């Protein structure tokens, strides 16, 4: 069997690791969220200085957007939750992920002289919220897919 030459296909190569409003708009499950897409929401992802980590945040934000249709969550809360889950999946402890996602809250606790275990309790509490739990459920790969092949 001989293969014939196929015409070159113009592909849209990924040239950026930044999230755009258009990308987010296309991933959202419902039109009601689209009006809440602001520069500030997009900047939560794009402000990450490490381009590889920024790419992970962007991809996960686009991948898990269906979670928004399962409850009453704000877009900003969703983006922060995705960052938190992404950091946890990459090996950060809850308190470390919490400090990266909410640096102002973390610094406020430090300024008040909170102990490490006290701060960890806030992070642990956040990790058990409904939104975080639903995003974590989305990250789980079914066993039949893992064992396929």
Q: Which residue ranges define each predicted feature?
A:
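N-terminal, charge-rich alpha-helical recognition modules
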Residues: 1-147
